[in-house]
Amino acid sequence: MSEGVEAIVANDNGTDQVNGNRTGKDNEEHDGSTGSNLSNFLWHGGSVWDAWFSCASNQVAQVLLTLPYSFSQLGMLSGIVLQIFYGLLGSWTAYLISVLYVEYRARKEKEGKSFKNHVIQWFEVLDGLLGSYWKALGLAFNCTFLLFGSVIQLIACASNIYYINDHLDKRTWTYIFGACCATTVFIPSFHNYRIWSFLGLGMTTYTAWYLAIASIIHGQAEGVKHSGPTKLVLYFTGATNILYTFGGHAVTVEIMHAMWKPQKFKYIYLMATLYVFTLTIPSAAAVYWAFGDALLDHSNAFSLMPKNAWRDAAVILMLIHQFITFGFACTPLYFVWEKVIGMHDTKSICLRALARLPVVIPIWFLAIIFPFFGPINSAVGALLVSFTVYIIPSLAHMLTYRSASARQNAAEKPPFFMPSWTAMYVLNAFVVVWVLIVGFGFGGWASVTNFVRQVDTFGLFAKCYQCKPAAAAAHAPVSALHHRL
């Protein structure tokens, strides 16, 4: 892999050392001009707050719209309990990833290696700590997950805009938003998401509380039923969507590397998750309370919301946020591709953007093939997220500190709430076994079964997934349209 200069990004953490006292923020204090200060304020982020906004914003994107669908599959109680359970589980494995990053960087810096001109990624951490086989494993799962994570954001864009303008079908909207999302090739790195992360979280916060308040004001639909859970296949499909929801930390290493003091990341993801709970639980519970089993055929919560200015505002804000989240998922892929083709040290932002474009093309194509908003989340959660951000980090932590000398010289000791290394091993083993059996095993069976059912029903390259039939829409009374796609 090339160790080129990330030339188009200010070297925010160029002098930062895990083992030392210097931080990259020193580099930003060289220019006191108003223009430079404004640019740094909006464009160059590396603080603890920047990392918190990035984690929270990235974690809670379009899943807000599919969680009510999951509640209809799981039932109210299971939906709430599993959100809390997987939220805490995800926070733990994000903590493990941060510990392994600090360990890798500390070891390399002791050897005299500088990361001033290199963006560290998860597969490189695995390579440095455990060897080339783990590097290949991490690279395969991480890249595939981020690829499909980007696909899901693109599908969500087309699904959402359709509820404002249904003159174009969802496939056409996918073409349009694929071109729009391709502009993320011009965003250099996670340093440069400062203002976008802040705005993105604000937009999702509005959407979450709109869903909750609008559902409560609407009240329960006539004849509403809350039958879930009724079938095992639906139950585990819903559970894996929640596993997917709180598995958004595949970009943890890149977010940490963008920080001025990455060793401060340890509990940031947990703090972000606690805030995310205030968005996901009230909104999903309220929508499910109002519409019940109708959500089983409406994987996008917007489809059941009354059409008005408040809903349109929520749709538009979610579209903007999905563009941001698309960039979050794609940026690590851009880095990998740049290193593969030897363009990571290119100074020209335009040449670098041009080199990144081939990454967007397969994402665009896959979004057109599999436009199944909702079911695809569960499939990705079971088959990719389960390994990428739950099983692999837990196993990697156990193997990294398997020897007494490694534990004694660890850059990060067990956290204050863990009495010993043994307790950490027990918890890590539980995560591996639980996610392997419940997430990948039962979840994989259920989500793939449901996904295949969507393919059989709608076909690949579906022109307008879950759209209302034109004839039915023309004759439906206006009031009834509030409860239809």
Curated annotation (Swiss-Prot):
Listed result of changing S57F: In aux1-120; agravitropism
Polar residues: compositionally biased ranges: 12-22
InterPro entries: AA_transpt_TM
Effect ascribed to mutating G178D: In aux1-112; agravitropism
Organism name: Arabidopsis thaliana
Spans annotated as Disordered: 12-33
Compartments reported by the entry: Cell membrane
Family: Belongs to the amino acid/polyamine transporter 2 family. Amino acid/auxin permease (AAAP) (TC 2.A.18.1) subfamily.
GO CC entries: cell surface; endosome; Golgi apparatus; plasma membrane
One BP term from GO: response to nematode
Tissue distribution of the protein: Expressed in root and shoot apical tissues. In root apex, confined to stele initials, protophloem poles, statolith-containing S2 columella cells, lateral root cap cells (LRC), and in epidermal cells from the distal elongation zone (DEZ) up to central elongation zone (CEZ).
Pfam family, one: Aa_trans
Biased composition (Basic and acidic residues): 23-32
Function statement: Carrier protein involved in proton-driven auxin influx. Mediates the formation of auxin gradient from developing leaves (site of auxin biosynthesis) to tips by contributing to the loading of auxin in vascular tissues and facilitating acropetal (base to tip) auxin transport within inner tissues of the root apex, and basipetal (tip to base) auxin transport within outer tissues of the root apex. Unloads auxin from the mature phloem to deliver the hormone to the root meristem via the protophloem cell files.
This protein's name: Auxin transporter protein 1
Effect caused by changing M305R: In aux1-102; agravitropism
Modulation of this protein's activity: Auxin uptake mediated by AUX1 is inhibited by chromosaponin-1 (CSI), 1-naphthoxyacetic acid (1-NOA) and 3-chloro-4-hydroxyphenylacetic acid (CHPAA).
